[in-house]
Design a protein with these regions (language model features):
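PLD/PLD-like phosphodiesterase catalytic module centered on the HKD motif
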Residues: 1-143
Length: 143
């Protein structure tokens, strides 16, 4: 006899959900991105790329490694081209209202952090391991 568990699958051997601000999230977010094995889906309501964008470089590296990179954005031709240039698939949604990053369909970064751009201490995000919740968020994005 075995009890079925609905506990989230912990892909990175740690189970911590933590709240971050617009400056403290970067270190952990980049660690999580670096460990991505299959997919990274980012939804960004605003695109503010610096001339040298660390996140774009990381996403380009992931794409080159065979990790599927998908970006949900509002229409912006110049920024779309930058994202296509790093190997990301682009999904345009001009009514986009959610800022989220989902790594390997189980790790969620959710809040008002701009994962593809500029942030301040006023921005925040929560990091959650939950594959069922990740599937629900992906369903919202893709419909």
């Amino acid at each position: 006899y075995q009890i079925k568990s609905n506990a989230p699958i912990d892909l990175f051997n740690e189970s911590q959900s933590v709240i971050f601000n617009g400056h403290t999230y970067q270190s952990e977010f980049f660690k999580d991105l670096h460990q991505a094995k299959r997919s990274v889906v980012i939804s960004a309501t605003k695109l503010w790329f610096a001339k040298h964008s660390s996140v774009l470089e990381m996403l380009k590296e992931l794409s080159a490694r065979g990790v599927e990179v998908v970006a949900f954005i509002k229409s912006n031709l110049e920024k779309e081209e930058k994202l296509k240039g790093i190997g990301a698939s682009i999904r345009i949604n001009d009514t986009l209202a959610i800022d989220v990053a989902i790594i390997d369909k189980s790790l969620i970064w959710y809040g008002n952090i701009n994962y593809l751009g500029y942030n301040t201490d006023e921005n925040n995000a929560i990091r959650i391991y939950d594959s069922a919740l990740a599937e629900n968020v992906l369903e919202v994005l893709y419909t």
